[in-house]
Amino acid sequence: YCDGYEVLTSYRNSKNYGDNWISAGYALWFIRESRYLNNARMLMNTSCAVSGTGFFFSRKVIESAGGWTFHLLTEDSEFSVHQILKGQKIGFCAGAILYDEQPVTFRQSWRQRMRWARGCLQVFRKYGVGLLKGMGRGSFSCYDMSMTVLPAFVLTVGLIVTYLVVATVTAVDGIPFWPCLIYILRALFGMYQTLFIIGLFTTVTEWDNIYTSTGKKIWYTFTFPLFMITYIPISVAALFTKVKWKPIEHHRADRKVLETAAGRSGK
């Protein structure tokens, strides 16, 4: 705030990384987002983006917006896009760490990520024209946010359409299905490899910020791509499903994680 930022977001960490592959998948993605998206944006002197609830804004910001008027399914993304279109630059404070609690069941995860997927569509529907105009004026932040809220759907739908076309042509022409299946499996394996490299790099560089055992850090690096690949059916379902906001229950207060983090920061 003293550096002139009216909006700041934090380093989004998690207190239950080691619960299972689902909580670890969330946690690793958010750590990557903090270190390699928002921190990179700060180094480039462009706007960051709010993620989750660990953020700060001045009274001036909320008054200029007429109160908290952001009620789409992904209000954090909506708030970020709104501020960027108003010319506000969002900052990132790496020393302000939020210890979030992540879902641990696939049912909870499906419901939450379905909301996020649908919410991103809502944000682009409401602010897409403004973002495109900003891109036309040379705004990197508008381009950045467009790539943040839209690509998952574009890539997913494109992938599904491609597979359906290939499968249809195969069936009509009487071509054996096995080559098509091999193509699909190769594509999925390529996705797995890319996501594994992303997860591995983040795990290695942010090792001391991940609060679980060494074995779990290593194991959940291998399950991270599987967690991310489940976004494909979720994204497709979000296109055709009416999604409502439902709370995700939180019950934990992992004092051990917080005490360990406090001890490390005091070194």
Model regions and ranges:
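Long helical/loop segments within the catalytic core of UDP-sugar-dependent glycosyltransferases
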Residues: 1-72, 114, 121, 125
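Catalytic donor-sugar/metal-binding loop of nucleotide-sugar-dependent glycosyltransferases
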Residues: 45, 80-99
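Short, hydrophobic alpha-helical packing/hinge segments within bilobed ligand-binding/sensory domains
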Residues: 79-80, 109
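Juxtamembrane C-terminal module of membrane proteins
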Residues: 129-145, 169-267
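Active-site-adjacent helix/loop segment of glycosyltransferases
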Residues: 110-149, 161
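Hydrophobic, aromatic-rich transmembrane alpha-helices
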Residues: 157-173
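Nucleotide-sugar-dependent glycosyltransferase catalytic core
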Residues: 101-118, 249-252
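Transmembrane helical bundle of ABC transporter permease
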Residues: 27, 31, 104-108, 216
